[in-house]
């Protein structure tokens, strides 16, 4: 349901039609409102859509919540998605990393590049986030103005053990604040302290 993945789903559907299938990995790190948004965006595009159950919390290195957390998250999540796709006869899984991601610290990207069955076409052709937003606008995709998003585990300070309870606390807090604020809302979990970030 993000800017890049929605654009990629729309592009895949334009090229492949009903041969394309959008997958959304559902886990404790994925907020409920994003699940609903994924469904509505798939309906808007016209692409078939399936939720696939995954759990990054199965990985102890992910739960430790170090600076390489995203590496273990992507590894766990995409291993499940690749297995699901292969079992149903799909040759490739494509995901929405873009050219700008090469400029940032992205340990998750490293894990994707280690997977033979995962491709990142937006990155491979050099599309930037701004270009993706512009084309999304031209295609009438509402996500062209959507703020950047990250999974709930990114709200927990490094070193703070990731648990279902802490993820649920963040999701509930953001849900309440979102009733009063437009745009991006993030509640940073620092154990006994929460730091709220909203757009001005």
Question: Model-predicted segments: where are they?
Answer:
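ATP-dependent adenylation/nucleotidyltransferase module used to activate substrates
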Residues: 1-138, 194
């Amino acid at each position: 349901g993000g800017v890049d993945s929605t654009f990629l789903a729309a592009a895949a559907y334009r090229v492949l039609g009903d041969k394309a299938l959008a997958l959304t990995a559902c886990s404790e790190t994925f907020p409920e409102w994003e699940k609903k948004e994924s469904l509505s965006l798939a309906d808007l595009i016209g692409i078939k859509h399936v939720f696939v159950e995954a759990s990054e919390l199965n990985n102890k290195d992910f739960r430790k919540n170090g600076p390489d957390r995203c590496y273990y998250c992507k590894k766990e999540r995409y291993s499940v998605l690749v297995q699901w796709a292969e079992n149903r006869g799909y040759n490739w899984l494509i995901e929405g990393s873009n050219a700008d991601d090469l400029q940032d610290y992205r340990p998750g990207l490293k894990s994707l590049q280690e997977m033979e069955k995962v491709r990142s076409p937006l990155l491979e052709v050099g599309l930037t986030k701004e270009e993706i937003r512009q084309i999304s606008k031209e295609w009438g995709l509402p996500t062209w103005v959507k703020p950047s998003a990250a999974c709930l585990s990114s709200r927990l300070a490094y070193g703070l053990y990731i648990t279902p309870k802490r993820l649920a606390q963040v999701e509930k807090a953001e849900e309440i604040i979102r009733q009063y604020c437009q745009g991006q809302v993030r509640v940073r979990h620092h154990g006994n302290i929460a730091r709220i970030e909203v757009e001005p």
